[in-house]
Amino acid sequence: MSLYPSLEDLKVDKVIQAQTAYSANPASQAFVLVDASAALPPDGNLYPKLYPELSQYMGLSLNEAEICESMPMVSGAPAQGQLVARPSSVNYMVAPVTGNDAGIRRAEIKQGIREVILCKDQDGKIGLRLKSIDNGIFVQLVQANSPASLVGLRFGDQVLQINGENCAGWSSDKAHKVLKQAFGEKITMTIRDRPFERTVTMHKDSSGHVGFIFKSGKITSIVKDSSAARNGLLTDHHICEINGQNVIGLKDAQIADILSTAGTVVTITIMPTFIFEHIIKRMAPSIMKSLMDHTIPEV
């Protein structure tokens, strides 16, 4: 089954397929598009879960009942008429409209655990501040153009291991001490990406808009029949990135400027407000506004 970064890409590819099939065998039956409202599969859920399962994060207990109450968009089938998008590898996407867009590559989410290797800069630093929360070590700050920024570490990521040592139960001081004493040429970190993120790729209309309104970084409404609506953007979600560029901690005017200067294809990374606000509450929000990395990552 083909995967697409946006609904526009899917529709154009369907037309291309139909034209190709007709050209190859014009006498054959007409190409029929299957109605998206087809019957649900036996499990009653047309869509897989949008987000990975997670029982604990920064002291937040996320059992099924609490997820249903606080984030109804996460569990079960979507309401009638609600559109859904889910993150997937850009390497396997069919994108006749979007093309090889750099924003999609920068914004790609790799759910699960990953390993990064970084080295210290000329000052012996990696540009990373960690914080101990409920026996876990989390990324509190990534500085611009630092080694930590270059390997893709993000605010809210959990550090599971440093150079093969489990970080569970460490204090913030111990984590920083281990990094300070580590060999500068190679530091290996095992990372669990911040949870419940997803990306949505949209296309600007003739007026340069994708069709959503936000306040304090939170998506508050979706414009009917816009690209945002067609591609499953949801309200009550916070914008974390635009085309892979971190916008957490920026003012609305700054976020609007980034959106307006983006190309015709815009990929945003969002997180349920319930989770986002919990992370911010535990992470000292004043640091975000003054020191956090907001540069455009390289791909």
Curated annotation (Swiss-Prot):
**PANTHER family according to UniProt:** SYNTENIN RELATED, SYNTENIN-1
Which Gene Ontology terms describe the biological processes this protein takes part in? negative regulation of receptor internalization; negative regulation of transcription by RNA polymerase II; positive regulation of cell growth; positive regulation of cell migration; positive regulation of cell population proliferation; positive regulation of epithelial to mesenchymal transition; positive regulation of exosomal secretion; positive regulation of extracellular exosome assembly
Major localization listed first in the record, in broad terms: other
Give the record's subunit note: Monomer and homodimer. Interacts with SDC1, SDC2, SDC3, SDC4, NRXN2, EPHA7, EPHB1, NF2 isoform 1, TGFA, IL5RA, NFASC, SDCBP2 and PTPRJ. Interacts with PDCD6IP. Forms a complex with PDCD6IP and SDC2. Interacts (via C-terminus) with TGFBR1. Binds to FZD7; this interaction is increased by inositol trisphosphate (IP3). Interacts with SMO.
Membrane topology, as annotated: Peripheral membrane protein
Transmembrane parts of this sequence: none
> Is Transferase given among the entry's keywords?
no
Q: Which GO terms describe its molecular function?
A: frizzled binding; identical protein binding; interleukin-5 receptor binding; phosphatidylinositol-4,5-bisphosphate binding; protein heterodimerization activity; protein sequestering activity; syndecan binding
What organism does the record attribute this protein to? Mus musculus
An annotated GO cellular component of this protein is: membrane raft
User: What are the start and end residues of every segment in region (Interaction with PDCD6IP)?
Assistant: 2-103
According to the UniProt entry, which residues carry Phosphoserine?
A: 6
Q: Where in the cell is it found?
A: Cell junction, Focal adhesion; Cell junction, Adherens junction; Cell membrane; Endoplasmic reticulum membrane
Query: Where along this sequence does the record place binding of a 1,2-diacyl-sn-glycero-3-phospho-(1D-myo-inositol-4,5-bisphosphate)?
Result: 251-252
Task: State the encoding gene.
Answer: Sdcbp
Q: Provide this UniProt record's keywords sorted from A to Z.
A: Acetylation, Cell junction, Cell membrane, Cytoplasm, Cytoskeleton, Endoplasmic reticulum, Lipid-binding, Membrane, Nucleus, Phosphoprotein, Repeat, Secreted
Where does the record place a coiled coil? Answer: none
**Protein name (record):** Syntenin-1
Q: Pfam families in the record, alphabetically?
A: PDZ (PF00595)
Which Gene3D superfamilies does its entry note? 2.30.42.10
SMART domains (alphabetical): PDZ (SM00228)
N-acetylserine carried by residues:
2
Which region is the signal sequence? none
